[in-house]
Amino acid sequence: MNKELLNCERVWLNVTPATLRPDLADYGLLEPHALGVHEGKIHALVPMQDLKGPYPAHWQDMKGKLATPGLIDCHTHLIFAGSRAEEFELRQKGVPYAEIARKGGGILSTVRATRAASEEQLFTLAAARIKSLIREGVTTVEIKSGYGLTLEDELKMLRVARRLGEALPIRVKTTLLAAHAVPPEYRDDPDSWVETICQEIIPAAAEAGLADAVDVFCEHIGFSLAQTEQVYLAADQYGLPVKGHMEQLSNLGGSALAANFGALSVDHLEHLDQEGIQALAHRGVVATLLPTAFYFLKETKLPPVAALRKAHVPMAVSSDINPGTAPIVSLRMAMNMACTLFGLTPVEAMVGVTRNAARALGEQERLGQLRVGMLADFLVWNCAHPAELSYLIGVDQLVSRVVNGEETLHG
């Protein structure tokens, strides 16, 4: 018996690993292997042809089924209260968003509902959404604040996010997005809101250990380039990496600014230009594509996928779960849309929810690949080929889900 396997607490025999290793072609597929876990990490990956018994006490034969890294949803807004279904109905009837917003709808309706909700209520609502992601193979999820827009309510959202990671079998990375919108209290003085973010909210979130990163919605209906830089400088003072909602509706040059700050990722990017692409390529910043928002908003301008590909910018894919522009709680659907709407290949979509998604969260040394030494977050699927994960939607193909070496689903 292989010595490394004998030291493992659990062994999965006869898995066909799609390793997603960058040094291997496409999905990084290997012949059937034994995968052993020790102390929450992948401790051994041994070809079945090299094995001889006896096996460790805790093993199971997966009969050649496909194994992949756990899926990573690296951009979500899944903590919120209230519903925007009525707004959706009005928009389908042709009512402009500006009119809906004037009547109290839009993002500020979500802000009011989220402020009014207790931590327990927000936890219950968000847990239901996360459980849907868990069922389709998500093992790590990023969750943003941004619907509180006061010091206490932003911290409330981040506390809920931390609780979700403690209570449910999923890794949670938190992002402070106080610069999501200007709250009504600061409507006539948005610069003062930016000062509040920089001088009060970022310090409080950092000192409480509630934020893993800081994000800004840099857009003509959001925050200017100068305001974004101000928030990034404050984040940098507290050692927090930055991210950005960039170039979704127009091109303000936010991606180049974010790249100058060594951002983990910039997201949306429908209006990204060549200068921005080169800045991302130069600094190795991840471009996160959000096809569900593109679909839901009926956008027509596509992100420059071919140019990103040519420049070797790493592309991630995420669900962007939120009540206003992407009420679609499915990373698998986002993978499909990334292929059908944006022109990614199924390989690129899979890399986008594993290896590159891990990089978008600063977790590329621990997550996103099947290799010895990585955290033991992996999935076993009842499907013939990894492309099925982007192709076939709505069918439960998940056989085994492992997080930190602990099995949380076995069919």
From Swiss-Prot:
One GO BP: L-histidine catabolic process to glutamate and formate
InterPro entries: Amidohydro-rel (IPR006680), HutI (IPR005920), Metal-dep_hydrolase_composite (IPR011059), Metal_Hydrolase (IPR032466)
Main location: cytoplasm
Cofactor(s) this protein requires: Zn(2+); Fe(3+)
GO cellular component: cytoplasm
Pfam family, one: Amidohydro_1
Molecular function GO labels: imidazolonepropionase activity; iron ion binding; zinc ion binding
EC number: 3.5.2.7
Subcellular location(s) of the protein: Cytoplasm
Binding positions for Zn(2+) per the UniProt entry: 75, 77, 245, 320
Binding site for N-formimidoyl-L-glutamate: 147, 322, 324
Pathway given in the UniProt record: Amino-acid degradation; L-histidine degradation into L-glutamate; N-formimidoyl-L-glutamate from L-histidine: step 3/3
Transmembrane segments: none
The keyword Transmembrane helix appears for this protein: no
Biological function: Catalyzes the hydrolytic cleavage of the carbon-nitrogen bond in imidazolone-5-propanoate to yield N-formimidoyl-L-glutamate. It is the third step in the universal histidine degradation pathway.
Family: Belongs to the metallo-dependent hydrolases superfamily. HutI family.
The protein, known as: Imidazolonepropionase
Organism per entry: Aeromonas salmonicida (strain A449)
